[in-house]
Amino acid sequence: MSQSFLSRLPLSRFELDRDHLGRERPALFDELWANPATRILLIFQGSALLATPDSLALLPVDAVPHFSERVYLGTSTSTTSPEPAGTPIVAVELDDAGHLAESDWANLRQVGSRLSDRDAGLLTEALGILNWHTSHRFSPRTGEPTVSEKGGWVRRDPVSGGEVFPRTDPAIIVGVTDADDRILLGSNALWESNRYSLLAGFVEPGESLESAVMREVHEESGLRVVDPVYLGSQPWPFPASLMVGFTARVEDGFTGAATPDGAEILDRGAQVADASGV
């Protein structure tokens, strides 16, 4: 896996120490709120407050309005950002945006590729963990409201004492090529017309990543593929996925045509004549 390939995965970039030991301090948020160096990343309805079109706004604690959730993201390791290395950063989810205009906010899909390594990592981490909080407010055992602890990285059931930890859903995305070096593309049933992508799908329980590649391609296109090769991974917090990239090739001697499944994939194309640069 080359660094040049990883540099093309904008959400895999980071310049942050997640400081897992700091999460264990019982008075962590009291300490952070008393520290004038602490900076806050505001999140509202899945979007972040921007300082410029290509940078996040990080505010001092006393500038933060009321919030519904907060998570300690860690300390910056960037030496090129306005805030010095070692700056502690907390993500805060707002109930409302107050006086801030809609144009002051942007979501990760809009700005992810434009952000610095530090800011891309911050926003990706913040969205992933805040999405987890949204979907785990109640205990799966007792139905009681859970309590956020350890810097926002654990939720505890106050009745049973059981702890719930963040989870990530692995999904594969695969570039399939044939003997003529054409690449397989598909159009999702939920997309607008003439929009295509590589085939992708979630990994099922008890399944390896490589097996998921072969199963998903066959289910969605009817093709049999072999030799899945791992390329790299990218977090995809929409809401909680890790996209794991592979290449694979159509099995030698396979003569069937690619056929969309009609449910998830409505169309397929192999119009990229030369896949070597993809």
Predicted regions and their residues:
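Cys/His-rich short segments
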Residues: E125-G175
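A gly/proline- and charged-residue-enriched helix-loop-helix capping module
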Residues: A97-R141
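Unchanged
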Residues: V64-R114, V203-V278
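N-terminal strand-loop-strand
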Residues: R155-S197, F202, R224-V225, V229, ...
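Residues in well-ordered beta-strands of folded domains
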Residues: L42-F44, G74, V90-E93, V147, ...
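Generic structural "secondary-structure junction" signal
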Residues: R13-R18, R23, D117, W132-T134, ...
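N-terminal alpha-helical interaction blocks
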Residues: M1-L115
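Short secondary-structure junctions
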Residues: A57-V61, P145-V147, P228-V229
